[in-house]
A protein has these predicted regions:
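Catalytic domains of carbohydrate-active enzymes that cleave complex glycans
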Residues: 349-352, 360, 364-372, 376-430, ...
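Mature N-terminal, pre-catalytic/accessory segment of carbohydrate-active enzymes
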Residues: 18-294, 392-393, 586-602
Length: 602
């Protein structure tokens, strides 16, 4: 049986090998990278398509250093637009919270070895400190991006010709692996400092120094102060926020050139899935058919379940890979939910191994067809028995996305026939008549659940969330979006009393994700939030900050209700009303968040 299972990966492995043999990389946009493909530790950014405007540097002489803003993607070719140099920055944090600051250097002369050294944070007047193990420091590197569609209404649609879109280098990857960078004259470089305050930290003001150097020569020092409150955030595993970012294990196998589902593959995946866990990730993404989304990503989702039609016409299903994937993710710490895609794939085509002909075959069938009901009743009956044996049945969802109402109704009927207790999830359009059948319901930002539906689902313990995709121009998570829009997402969930947020792609990397985030379908960055080498990003970091805000808001709500502090509760709810997507981008997400934080004392 193992021979049959791994036969299905032959095509994948051949494509991995061909890429590994390339002498130099090439991006989705056809740009040569002039370096080995698929870099992990060190790499060179692509040339900047925007030339330096000397007039903008007239007032920026010498080497300049300052704290900047985490709301800004500083342009590589322009001096930082700061009205004054800021040498000290003050941040507020609860115990257990992550907070971050961005420093920035802009220089009219070359720097051969720019680096930053961050010391531990010491508590004023006491011996307590937050040591370096709680601090992430890295350069904010540059990646190629593009823009919204010409009509400004979103980022959906094929983009076969990159020249039709304005392409620039943009700050996004946070590179904690590169110890130093060489900067040419007339360039700007940001650096990130993130502190994860220990849950048992003593409240008070903690101070650290950031020394920025060019080789051995110190360019300057910046002071970071964190005001730690006595309140405490729970650990991410205990966050209420339901974060569902679809993981793509196949992208990691391709990028690292390892055999899918080998021990090495799991070792390469671990850092990325730990990052997802530490962001509060709750859901394991499983593909139970071949290409449930018709290969829309560069690295298509292959099936984790082997489908075999035996010579006698009966069906056999092998769950070896599915089990290994789920067990691995649970070992990492993702244990709340398993979503299995999809009974209604985009092509309505199902691949299986045919024992009689010793070949791979396809069945094309749709909900409502007799054949559809027969094959899925067989599969789901087998699957339910297997899940019950493993102890996973209660957390496993049969999942669909963006499917028509009639197809959903028929699919639900087939699921209930196979096992009436199966849980079902949908990420798609709002159909309130489906709500009772959906244990996990996620609709697009523009669609609004009625208060009645939200309240009923809350009472029944069902998950109710929302998503953004390529359709929303604002807010979104493209690499050219203002970083604060990623934080806005968590705040909005708090305003709407939703359980969380879904984004369809955590790590569906393009060919060279560290260098060029553009894709031949959709706006740049739509397919991934994190980078090779276990690198985080401005987008991912700000998303986590929004999730933390959600947790803090809900903790305060519970406290105010318990203590009957109606005035404080009303003030909080009034502040949350500012999170209205209709006001973006005229009022920026950054300004909105700043106003609300000031009102709430965050």
């Amino acid at each position: 049986m193992k021979k049959i299972i791994f036969l299905l990966w032959g095509t994948v492995l051949m494509s991995l090998t061909s890429f590994a043999q390339q002498a130099g990389g090439i991006t989705h946009s056809g740009l040569p990278t002039h370096q080995p493909p698929f870099p992990v530790v060190s790499y060179q950014e692509l040339p900047n398509p925007v030339s330096v405007d000397a007039s903008k540097w007239k007032g920026a002489k010498g080497i300049n250093l300052s704290w900047g803003s985490t709301d800004v993607r500083y342009k590589k070719e322009e001096p930082a637009p700061l009205s004054r140099v800021q040498q000290v920055i003050d941040l507020k944090a609860w115990r257990g919270e992550r907070v971050a600051a961005q420093w920035v250097v802009w220089t009219d002369q070359p720097l051969q070895e720019l680096k930053a050294e961050v010391g531990g944070l010491k508590l004023k007047g006491k011996k307590a400190e937050i040591d370096r193990s709680h601090i992430l420091s890295g350069f904010v590197r540059y990646v190629m991006t593009d823009e919204l569609n010409p009509d400004g209404r979103g980022g959906c649609g094929h983009r076969p010709d990159a020249s039709q879109f304005d392409s620039t280098l943009v700050a996004d990857p946070i590179d904690h692996l590169t110890p130093s960078l060489e900067l040419p004259a007339h360039s700007t470089q940001g650096g990130w400092v993130r502190v994860w305050v220990p849950a048992d930290a003593e409240p008070g003001v903690y101070t650290a120094e950031v020394a920025v150097k060019n080789g051995a020569k110190e360019l300057g020092r910046l002071t970071l102060r964190i005001h730690v409150d006595s309140r405490q955030l729970p650990a991410p595993k205990d966050w209420a926020f339901h974060l569902d970012l679809w993981q793509n294990p196949f992208a990691i196998a391709r990028y690292y050139g390892v055999k899918p589902w080998s021990q090495e593959h799991f070792e390469k995946m671990r850092p990325y899935m730990e990052m997802y866990r530490d962001a509060g990730g709750k859901v394991i993404t499983a593909s139970v058919i071949h290409k449930p989304w018709n290969g829309q990503t560069y690295d298509p989702f292959e099936t984790m379940v082997t489908w075999m039609k035996k010579a006698d016409g009966t069906w056999f299903f092998d769950y070896t890979i599915f089990d290994r994937w789920v067990e691995f993710m649970m070992e990492v710490g993702i244990t709340k939910e398993i979503t299995c895609y999809s009974m209604v794939p985009w092509r309505l085509s199902f691949q299986y191994y045919d024992q009689a002909t010793n070949s791979l075959q396809e069945i094309k069938t749709k909900p409502g067809d007799k054949e559809f009901e027969e094959i899925w009743t067989a599969m789901l009956t087998s699957f339910a028995a297997h899940l019950k044996e493993k102890g996973w049945f209660g957390i496993t969802h049969i999942s669909m996305d963006e499917r028509p109402l009639d197809a959903m109704k028929e699919t639900i009927r087939v699921i209930r026939k196979a096992d009436p207790d199966f849980k079902i999830s949908l990420a798609g359009a709002l159909h309130e008549e489906l709500s009772d059948d959906l244990d996990d319901y996620c609709v697009a930002l523009r669609m609004k659940y009625s208060q009645e539906v939200k309240s009923k689902r809350k009472r029944e313990g069902k998950v109710t969330t929302y998503y953004t995709s390529c359709e929303e121009p604002f807010p979104n998570t493209f690499t050219f979006c203002p970083p604060a829009e990623c934080e806005w997402l968590g705040w909005y969930a708090a305003r709407e009393n939703l359980d969380g947020y879904l984004r369809w792609a955590y790590n569906s990397w393009v060919i060279e994700p560290l260098l060029d985030s553009r894709f031949y379908t959709w706006a740049a960055g739509d397919t991934y939030l994190i980078y090779p080498g276990g690198r985080t990003s401005l987008r991912f970091e700000r998303m986590i900050q929004g999730i933390q805000a959600y947790e803090k808001v809900n903790m305060l709500k519970s406290e105010y209700v318990k203590r009957n502090q109606k005035g404080k509760l009303k003030k909080l709810e009034k502040a949350l009303e500012l999170f209205d997507e209709g006001k973006l981008p005229q009022e920026s997400a950054a300004d909105c968040i700043k106003k609300v934080k000031q009102r709430l004392g965050f």
